[in-house]
Regions:
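Mature extracellular or lumenal effector domains of secreted proteins
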Residues: 1-184
Length: 184
């Protein structure tokens, strides 16, 4: 992948329109990411930790687009301590939810509300990545269950509602909508 200088490894890939795309295939070892062509592959936090141990990646890139919404969320963790905190969190090396503002760089095609309004992320506009709350499987689902979200408005979510969310809340899906995560 040549985005932002290249070197990206695809670790999560969900594309609507493929058969049974809403029946996600959870990879509990990073070795399962070779199944990316199924277009319904998500990766667990423990698999990210395993991958980090072997690859020591320094950045994570989040990219989703939902055609009915007309917006794209496309950010890369920043090459600074705030961006590193995001990498550490999504790799399961810490349980401290990282601050969102200053932790990422918006890519050229990003026109999302989420990326524009980082101080409003999480419950109570805490301005943090991820999701807190009871009943949430934070040890498994960090990358695909509310990785970034503004309560009741704009979400990155492949768990809570059947119409997966990308910078929206419950908008209708279209064939070709996608959610991808890369590391390098």
């Amino acid at each position: 992948m040549t985005t932002d200088g290249g070197g990206w490894l695809l670790v999560m890939n969900v594309i609507t329109g493929s058969s049974h795309y809403n029946q996600l295939s959870l990879m509990t070892s990073y070795r399962g990411i070779s199944d990316y062509h199924s277009n319904k592959m998500v990766i667990s936090t423990s698999a990210m930790k395993e991958l980090y141990g072997d690859l020591n990646f320094q950045q994570i890139r989040f990219h989703c687009r939902k055609h009915s919404v007309g917006r794209t969320f496309h950010v890369v963790t920043a090459a600074n301590s705030s961006g590193n905190a995001v990498v550490q969190y999504f790799s399961g090396l810490t349980d401290v939810e990282p601050v969102s503002c200053g932790s990422y760089v918006r890519m050229e095609d990003d026109n999302s509300e989420l990326a524009r309004r980082c101080s409003e992320w999480n419950y109570g506009q805490a301005g943090k990545w991820s999701r807190t709350g009871k009943g949430w499987k934070n040890t498994v689902q960090r990358l695909y269950n509310h990785a970034a979200w503004i309560y009741g408005q704009y979400h990155w979510d492949l768990v809570d509602r059947n119409s997966f969310e990308c910078d929206d809340m419950s908008a209708s899906p279209s064939s070709g909508d996608f959610w991808k995560v890369f590391v390098r």
